[in-house]
């Protein structure tokens, strides 16, 4: 019985890995995610390449980039 308990404890302690800023299960805390989004959304204006549009600028937000990546037809 002791050997089984020791084996289970060793398995749990060796397999448990938490990265800094992450909760168990690979989930981030909401506050840190919100801070990351705010840091990404600096409000800067990004110029598009000249092949796409001549001197046209548009403001890119993180969710706009994600939408364009997953739904390019829109």
From Swiss-Prot:
Keyword Nucleotide-binding recorded: no
GO cellular component: extracellular space
Keywords recorded for this protein, A-Z: Amidation, Cleavage on pair of basic residues, Hormone, Pyrrolidone carboxylic acid, Secreted, Signal
PROSITE patterns in the cross-refs: GNRH (PS00473)
InterPro entries the UniProt entry points to: GnRH, Gonadoliberin
Cleavable signal peptide: 1-15
Residues with Glycine amide modification: 25
Chain positions found as Pyrrolidone carboxylic acid: 16
Acetylation found in the keyword field: no
Record GO terms (molecular function): gonadotropin hormone-releasing hormone activity; gonadotropin-releasing hormone receptor binding
Subcellular location(s) per record: Secreted
Cystine pairs: none
Highest taxon in the source lineage: Eukaryota
Function: Stimulates the secretion of gonadotropins.
Family to which this protein belongs: Belongs to the GnRH family.
The protein's name in its UniProt record: Progonadoliberin-3
Native species: Oncorhynchus tshawytscha
């Amino acid at each position: 019985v002791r050997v089984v308990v020791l084996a289970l404890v060793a398995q749990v302690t060796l397999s448990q890995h938490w990265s800094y800023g992450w909760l168990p299960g690979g989930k981030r805390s909401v506050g840190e995610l919100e801070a990351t989004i705010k840091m990404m959304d600096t409000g800067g204006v990004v110029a598009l390449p000249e092949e796409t549009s001549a001197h046209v600028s548009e403001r890119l937000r993180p969710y706009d980039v994600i939408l364009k990546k997953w739904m390019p037809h829109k």
